């Protein structure tokens, strides 16, 4: 084993347990973090937060959510443009809801459960969206950005964004659009649409 010396003079508490370690780069659009209960030093590609372990677990749950990734896809000036990671200042300025005691406990339970089953993150996503008080249509928008915008950035012309939608999806889109136009202009206006197969006469 090798002993490492911490030469940092300011904010040395970030290396003391318990602390949250945040990776500035992502894995398939998800940002990774971990709560450590032992002292550790790390390099410039990792960020550290020292604090109460319950709050650190809560932050880790929020950071691992699609809400966190969605926010930075839309607001970050470099991610998906010239760099494949976030800058420290961008992470520190992320708006995060202040939890109450019950929400802290729930976040800790989710965090502990994901330690044993990291792929079962449904509870994490639901918790994060509830914390931000997101409506159903806002959740759809978040999923679409991750599933299509990020996927296009990652896979380019192999992205699912280029796959032809199913007939049912076209019909659902038409019904939604017709409903919006009817609510906007009133029932007195008649709207109709046609679904073309092949090249559309436009």
Whereabouts are the PLM-identified features?
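Polybasic, glycine- and aromatic-enriched phosphate-binding surface used to engage nucleic acids
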Residues: 1-104, 171-202
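Non-catalytic DNA-recognition/assembly elements of restriction-modification systems
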Residues: 98-202
């Amino acid at each position: 084993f090798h002993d490492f010396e911490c030469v940092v003079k300011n904010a040395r508490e970030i290396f003391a347990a318990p602390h949250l370690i945040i990776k500035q780069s992502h894995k398939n659009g998800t940002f990774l973090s971990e709560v450590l209960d032992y002292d550790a030093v790390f390099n410039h590609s990792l960020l550290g937060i020292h604090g109460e372990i319950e709050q650190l677990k809560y932050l880790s749950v929020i950071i691992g959510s699609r809400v966190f990734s969605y926010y930075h896809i839309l607001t970050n000036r470099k991610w998906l443009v010239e760099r494949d990671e976030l800058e420290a200042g961008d992470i520190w300025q992320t708006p995060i809801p202040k939890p109450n005691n019950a929400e802290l406990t729930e976040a800790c339970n989710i965090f502990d459960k994901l330690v044993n089953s990291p792929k079962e993150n449904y509870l994490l996503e639901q918790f994060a969206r509830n914390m931000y008080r997101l409506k159903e249509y806002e959740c759809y928008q978040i999923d679409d950005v991750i599933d299509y915008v990020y996927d296009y950035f990652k896979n380019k012309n192999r992205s699912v964004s280029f796959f032809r939608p199913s007939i049912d999806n076209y019909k659902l889109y038409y019904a939604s659009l017709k409903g919006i136009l009817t609510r906007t202009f009133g029932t007195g206006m008649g709207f109709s649409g046609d679904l073309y197969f092949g090249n559309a006469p436009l």
